[in-house]
């Protein structure tokens, strides 16, 4: 029987903010041969970067996918066999009314509709997320 391939997607490293990436880079050696850690090719939130990252995620998706960091939108490429871990809500939803609306849909509503599981790192983030996005009634936050 073939082992299931798990892919953990992390955002592209940024010098000013990379603690999550450092943690996963340290842990990957303990997770087994069937787990692969992939850094996305583009940073930032430009349309071009988002499209390239979604395409990359689709091309490299595994049997099980874990999205961590602030790139939840790549669930549009990984599909439903995805776990999204949300570390922070408020830092993503910034800007004017139009920007906030787009980010809520692209970073939260659409990915959370697609992903099979969603985890948050704290009760505060669970509350923040529940207040700002639409969640399916049967979708539980871990």
Range-by-range predicted roles:
Residues 15-18, 73-76, 91-94, 127-129:
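Short catalytic/ligand-binding loop motif for oxyanion handling, primarily in non-cytosolic enzymes
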Residues 64-66, 76-95:
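Active-site proximal beta-strand in glycosyltransferases
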Residues 7-9, 84, 120, 142:
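Structural beta-sheet core signal
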Residues 3-74:
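Active-site donor-binding segments of glycosyltransferases and PAPS-dependent sulfotransferases
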Residues 99-118:
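Membrane-proximal helix-turn-helix segments that form the acceptor-binding/catalytic region
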């Amino acid at each position: 029987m073939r082992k299931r391939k798990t892919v953990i997607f992390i955002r592209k490293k940024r010098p000013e903010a990379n603690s999550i990436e450092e943690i996963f880079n340290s842990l990957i050696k303990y997770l087994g041969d069937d787990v692969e850690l992939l850094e996305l090719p583009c940073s930032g939130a430009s349309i071009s970067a988002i499209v390239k990252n979604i395409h990359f995620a689709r091309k490299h998706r595994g049997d099980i996918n874990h999205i961590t960091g602030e790139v939840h939108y790549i669930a549009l490429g990984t599909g439903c066999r995805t776990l999204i871990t949300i570390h922070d809500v408020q830092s993503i939803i910034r800007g004017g009314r139009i920007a906030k609306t787009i980010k809520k849909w692209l970073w939260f509503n659409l990915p959370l509709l697609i992903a099979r599981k969603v985890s948050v790192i704290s009760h505060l983030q669970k509350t923040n997320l529940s207040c700002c996005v639409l969640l399916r009634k049967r979708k539980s936050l871990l």
